[in-house]
Each structure stands twice: as structure tokens, then as C-alpha cells.
Swiss-Prot record:
Active-site residues, as the UniProt record annotates them: C10
SUPFAM superfamilies, per database record: Peptide methionine sulfoxide reductase
Protein name: Peptide methionine sulfoxide reductase MsrA
A Pfam short name: PMSR
GO biological process, one term: protein modification process
This enzyme's EC code(s): 1.8.4.11
Organism: Streptococcus agalactiae serotype III (strain NEM316)
Reaction equations catalysed: L-methionyl-[protein] + [thioredoxin]-disulfide + H2O = L-methionyl-(S)-S-oxide-[protein] + [thioredoxin]-dithiol; [thioredoxin]-disulfide + L-methionine + H2O = L-methionine (S)-S-oxide + [thioredoxin]-dithiol
UniProtKB keywords: Oxidoreductase
Amino acid sequence: MERAIFAGGCFWCMVQPFEELDGIESVLSGYTGGHVENPTYKEVCSKTTGHTEAVEIIFNPEKISYANLVELYWAQTDPTDAFGQFEDRGDNYRPVIFYENEEQRQIAQKSKDKLQASGRFDRPIVTSIEPADTFYPAEDYHQAFYRTNPARYALSSARRHAFLEENWH
């Protein structure tokens, strides 16, 4: 098994697209990239921990490639917005591909370059590509939020879904 970590705004919205794929062992919502150990949601939302909301994906590379995961990642985000995603603003919601090793870094960078060259967006692709750091799972009530709180999930993800439909589908 291998690990991928992606940040794309609110972690609630980043779980379902990956969780439904063959070859995915698990998708956890959590926090990474900050300077506080074991942060809470409240602490991360206070924007004092340096953490970004992200998802940790454990996958079987014999069934799905990291490159495929990166391509799906792009289609869940606005890669031209470095200051958050959709209705969620601030560094704790910034888009980041966190890489585990040099191979993942190269795959992510090549994919980013290809997206920029495609002309799909008229603004620069600003999603950051950074080395993975300690990943702290979020509190239980955040896990699989789209299943446990479907009405609130639908409300919180409406702008995201409209953007994705217009720009990726």
C-alpha cells in the first residue's frame, strides 16, 4: 500500500470522490503541515497552527496509480485559487499536493505543468506541491461526513459542485 495526501479546501468534500475508487483502502480527513502536534478542528480553524485540512488516501498501486489520483485531485479543486477553496478561505483551506517521495513529486509537477499548458484555465495554476509532513486524523465526526451528514454536506459543497460542473465536466 502507498499513501497520498491532498488538500483541496474543506476535507469533507475531498473524501467521496476518492473513497469510491477501486484500489482505495481508506480515506481519512485530517490536518497536516503545521507546527502544533495533534491539533483539534477548533485550533486549525483559528488559523494559528499552520495546518491545512487534507485527506490521507491509502491505496493499492497495483489497482490505481498515484498519477490517476493526482488527475482526480485536480478535478475536485479550483487550482487557480491559492487562498482557499470556494466558500472556505485561508491557509488552512489552501490547495496542496503533499508528496511522499521524489517519484510522487515528479508525477505531481508534471501533471501541474500539463494542466497549465492545457489552457483549461485563464489564470495560473497555483496549487502548491510540498513534502508530506505528519498527518493528524481529524475528529471522528469529520470522517465520511458526506455519509453521516448528507444535508449539511450538500449545503456546504454547493459552490464547489457548481464550479466543478462548469470547469471539469
